[in-house]
Amino acid sequence: MFSIKPGPRKLPIDNPSLLSWNITDGDLNSKLNTLEYLNCVTNIINACGVYPQDLKDREIISTFHAEKVINDLLKNDYKISLSPDTTYRELNKAAQRSITAPDRIGEGKIWVYQRDTMVERGDNSGVHQYGPAEHFTHIISDKPSPKDKYVAYAINIPDYELAADVYNINVTSPSGQQETFKILINPEHLRQTLERKSLTAVQKSQCEIITPKKPGEAILHAFNATYQQIRENMSEFARCHYGYIQIPPVTTFRADGPETPEEEKGYWFHAYQPEDLCTIHNPMGDLQDFIALVKDAKKFGIDIIPDYTFNFMGIGGSGKNDLDYPSADIRAKISKDIEGGIPGYWQGQVLIPFTIDPVTKERKQIHPEDIHLTAKDFEASKDNISKDEWENLHALKEKRLNGMPKTPPKSDQVIMLQNQYVREMRKYGVRGLRYDAAKHSKHEQIERSITPPLKNYNERLHNTNLFNPKYHEKAVMNYMEYLVTCQLDEEQMSSLLYERDDLSAIDFSLLMKTIKAFSFGGDLQTLASKPSSTISSIPSKRRILININHDFPNNGNLFNDFLFNHQQDEQLAMAYMAALPFSRPLVYWDGQVLKSTTEIKNYDGSTRVGGEAWLNKGCSTYQQLYNEFHALYIDKAGIWSAFEGVFATKNVLAFSRGDSVNINHSPHDGLVIINKGNEEVEGAWPNKLQPGKYKNMGSNSVNIIINNTRKIIPPGKAFMLRGGTLNINIPGRSALLLGKTGEPLNYLYL
């Protein structure tokens, strides 16, 4: 049992008439004022989290009490500032319980349970419904779990409390004293509650809420990583300027199904072979792990983008033969667990709680142990795509891939589940999806499966008043993987992007062009932005740029043409991609949960691609700096390339960046120089720099020469320039990304 004594903290109490609270904790009975109560709540959260093992203690830190506390403080003329506590990571799964079903508490040691009741209907039939339970009521002694004698509790947490999180609450007294506490709140519900109170306009003006800024716009592909792995590294991802994290498909899948050949068990590709969309349970985590991940990411301003497999189903179980999904063995395990007294866990993994018939509008509840797809929901053909059919678009769209049953656009059940899947993802705060293997889908299927389109959403500004929120419009990050290997592919993808202006796409054509330019004998000038031509057929604001993805190293030699010849070329290419306006780079990381290829070597034993580049969580020093440059310049349209001189050769590409850049050599505030050759290059950049504070965001130290004095600027180093023409020395096999970050005092001018 923990103690809720106030502790030694010096509290900013100006008004002794603040609301008092009667608190009971074991043998301790205390009457505390509001700020002492906040101190107790802070101690509980620090020691036990928001879900203490003794469930009755959860009442002490409920959002209901938190809202009363904040109302009390505002009425007594205290100032309040609320901000997400990024140091707090909830480990107890009850905090992420589905809003429609129960879940377990205490890291799998205690189970939450809602009674299964029969609701009678007029035709004398009935439907099972997980009815409301009392809030933290009694132990159900006749429902022990078969595992370790778990105990089942009856519990019901309101939706608004499920969406609550731990916030720092900075309290300033009327005399100016300050203290910071922890509190559990749902900001939107707090606003709605306080609007009904008799607060004055002045009192309302004293409550601000700080929303985290997006740390960048780059995308991290957290391939083959658990949701927990990603959560543990969230602060590092924010530090490295990632604004989005693409994660493995959020479905039910397994890597060791009974129909899976022994030699294929444990491999990464099972993540892309779903066996159920309605229930979330896989080697990366379950629904509660996923909800916790989205919550943690939001604290840092990062959006989660799940991979979405919408056109095939998996082959690990009997479903590949009888086309009943989930497969029989999955349904049997769930039923056995439920009958064994632990229904709360599986019902807690239901992402899609019900479907709505498009004609009758009747709601049908989803149960995890039921069949959700049958033979009528799949293409009739059971033929596999053969090796010589990879450029046959008809075969790609009609046939199976590696034996996986193909879903058609005609199945109302498939479309209904897919649309509901997207809606449920939005409810949990997902602001984008990455649509896998779109090349294998007919346009009609993409049109029906990716609906209704959500093009934009309102995001709260960084620092606003709780009662007068201000928003800015953000575009949803929906993008597709449409593998382009020929001109017909290019035309098909362009047509699809024209039809759906809410979709972006991975730019495979630009990747191939970049690989060729960085290869031995290749010409970097083919990547230069010129007034009369474009570097890609995909509009710049809808381009996702990659230098590697999960498919290329993990399919034998099938995608060797999409691999760079050397790891350093791969890194330099990323510098180029991060420097382009409007587009977003996607950085690959292999979390190695399932078997995969993490390094490809040349014949001489040197690393061709991969190795450290794929295993450092996308957080190498150079990648952090690339992402920082990208965040500074993504929305600045200006780009001007040198077309002659030492910085415009087959081995050297250079261009200015910034809003003021144009063909008339206006002063600029960003400079990119990439030298793929082995020899250093020295010269004067013809476009003048604006005066100000600059930072080397490139991969290597560079020499800047002013008045015959050579200054070495290492990566990450900030320095001041008075402006004008820049004389610079670029080492071989390196990239310079020079960005203006401001003009503060106390920096030495070069």
Curated annotation (Swiss-Prot):
The record, for SUPFAM superfamilies, names: (Trans)glycosidases (SSF51445), Glycosyl hydrolase domain (SSF51011)
Among Gene3D superfamilies, the record links this protein to:
Glycosidases (3.20.20.80), Golgi alpha-mannosidase II (2.60.40.1180)
| Gene Ontology molecular-function annotations | catalytic activity; cation binding
Q: Name the Pfam families for this protein.
A: Alpha-amylase_C
GO biological processes: carbohydrate metabolic process
| Name listed for the protein in its UniProt record | Putative uncharacterized protein YgaQ
Q: Which organism is it from?
A: Escherichia coli O157:H7
Give the encoding gene's name. Answer: ygaQ
